[in-house]
């Protein structure tokens, strides 16, 4: 089951891009 898209997912994506 896939968890619902949450704002935190977006934040994690942004953080990942920023960190790299």
From Swiss-Prot:
Keywords for the protein's UniProt record, in alphabetical order: Cholesterol metabolism, HDL, Lipid metabolism, Lipid transport, Oxidation, Secreted, Steroid metabolism, Sterol metabolism, Transport
Organism encoding this protein: Erythrocebus patas
Main location as per UniProt: secreted
Function: Participates in the reverse transport of cholesterol from tissues to the liver for excretion by promoting cholesterol efflux from tissues and by acting as a cofactor for the lecithin cholesterol acyltransferase (LCAT). As part of the SPAP complex, activates spermatozoa motility.
GO BP terms, alphabetized: cholesterol metabolic process; lipid transport; positive regulation of cholesterol efflux; positive regulation of phagocytosis; positive regulation of phospholipid efflux; protein stabilization
The family this protein is said to belong to: Belongs to the apolipoprotein A1/A4/E family.
GO molecular function, one term: protein homodimerization activity
Listed name of the protein: Apolipoprotein A-I
Subcellular locations according to the entry: Secreted
Quaternary structure and partners: Homodimer. Interacts with APOA1BP and CLU. Component of a sperm activating protein complex (SPAP), consisting of APOA1, an immunoglobulin heavy chain, an immunoglobulin light chain and albumin. Interacts with NDRG1. Interacts with SCGB3A2. Interacts with NAXE and YJEFN3.
Tissues of expression: Major protein of plasma HDL, also found in chylomicrons.
Chain residue ranges for the region called Disordered: 1-20
GO cellular component: high-density lipoprotein particle
